[in-house]
């Protein structure tokens, strides 16, 4: 009998390869938990596709109909967002603007049924010198700034609330001010010049080169690992991209850059999970790294898409980010209590007023603490549990050689 995590990975594997699950039986409580887990990982439509003809699932008609109905709704909504995004990108083309697309539609197209792999937003990388032109074009298209004070940041978010279209414009792929992963930008010097043209649904799109995109997917997951975690869908994206674009990827360069950033064991673990759980061959460039995956796989499956399903785990990211930042800069790591009072820069994304009024940092600390103690929608809040999770996840980073 498979547990819920095993059922999810089995369903995802089938959906990725255009197959259907072959389950002999499943209890109603198991199916209910599986559906909820698929929501947390944003793969519910793929679960529905894989389980569509499964007699065992159909023995629970209420849950089966709920699954199919919700999957159809999400897939239709994603198809509309994709169409709206392509219309938006065509509008930019007409303006002579060619931003580089990362993730999003470029990952969706890897799957047998692209719009079953849902995306909340679309990410665009631009030349910082052209930001004013892009900003003007987005406003003209009818989009609004999510945060009017964020236009000077490395990323700026826009939303069309009528179309439910969410766009993130990046001046760099990673926050250069981050002590933990700001150095992840280095391999992408010249990425705009190396970008390539592709086509999707008749629209010409510009995206990262195959090698740059492969590396970016790995590093993006690494960033989320530090911030609380990343889910099985991101691992699927990475492995699918590596498999589909493998001949176009400079794997030697990927391995070299991973070693520079000390994430080669982490990358090897993801590819091993792809081979063991998702039936996608491990790239030869990482075949020599024999690595256990049990702890990383559990971390991925237990945290949802971005490790924020548990509020205590979400807050534990302060500890993991601090551990890597200290390791990278060679300074002494701050204690757990100090991590509860992060520097202004670390809180600016959440408390926009700090950008213009840095002296309000103590107020932000108080607001953050109050929110932490009163928030309940993702489960009971416990500072001690957050510290415990943080310490456990620091050991995970140590296991994969990310920190010493």
Residue ranges and their predicted role:
Residues 1-120, 126-404:
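Conserved NTP-donor binding/palm subdomain of two-metal-ion nucleotidyltransferases/polymerases, i.e.
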């Amino acid at each position: 009998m498979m547990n819920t995590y095993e059922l999810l990975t089995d369903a995802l594997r089938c959906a990725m390869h255009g197959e259907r699950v072959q389950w002999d039986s499943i209890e109603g409580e198991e199916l209910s938990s599986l559906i909820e887990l698929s929501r947390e990982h944003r793969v519910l439509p793929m679960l529905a596709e894989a389980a569509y003809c499964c007699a065992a699932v159909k023995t629970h008609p209420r849950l089966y109909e709920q699954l199919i109905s919700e999957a159809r709704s999400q897939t239709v909504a994603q198809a509309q967002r994709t169409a709206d995004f392509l219309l938006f990108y065509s509008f930019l083309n007409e303006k002579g603007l060619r931003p580089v697309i990362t993730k999003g539609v470029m990952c969706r197209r890897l799957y047998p049924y692209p719009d079953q792999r849902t995306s909340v937003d679309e990410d665009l990388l631009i030349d910082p010198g052209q930001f004013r032109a892009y900003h003007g074009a987005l406003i003209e298209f009818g989009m609004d700034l999510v945060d009017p004070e964020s236009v000077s940041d490395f990323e700026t978010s826009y939303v069309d609330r009528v179309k439910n279209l969410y766009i993130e414009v990046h001046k760099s792929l990673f926050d250069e001010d981050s002590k933990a992963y700001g150095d992840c930008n280095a391999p992408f010097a010249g990425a705009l010049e190396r970008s390539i043209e592709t086509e999707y649904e008749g629209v010409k799109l510009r995206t990262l080169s195959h090698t740059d995109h492969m590396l970016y997917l790995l590093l993006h997951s690494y960033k989320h690992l530090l911030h609380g975690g990343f889910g099985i869908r991101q691992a699927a994206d990475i492995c699918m991209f590596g498999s589909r674009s493998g001949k176009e990827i400079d794997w030697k360069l990927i391995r070299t850059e991973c070693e520079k950033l000390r994430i080669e064991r982490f990358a090897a673990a993801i590819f091993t999970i792809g081979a063991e759980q998702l039936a996608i061959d491990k790239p030869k460039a990482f075949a020599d790294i024999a690595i256990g995956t049990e702890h990383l796989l559990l971390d991925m499956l237990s945290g949802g898409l971005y490790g924020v399903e548990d509020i205590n785990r979400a807050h534990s990211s302060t500890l993991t980010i601090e551990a890597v930042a200290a390791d990278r800069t060679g300074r002494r790591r701050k204690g757990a209590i100090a991590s509860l009072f992060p520097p202004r820069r670390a809180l600016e994304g959440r408390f926009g007023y700090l950008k213009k009024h840095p002296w309000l940092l103590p107020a932000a600390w108080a607001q953050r603490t109050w929110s932490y103690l009163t928030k309940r929608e993702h489960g009971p809040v416990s500072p001690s549990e957050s510290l415990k999770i943080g310490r456990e996840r620091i050991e995970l980073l140590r296991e994969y050689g990310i920190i010493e």
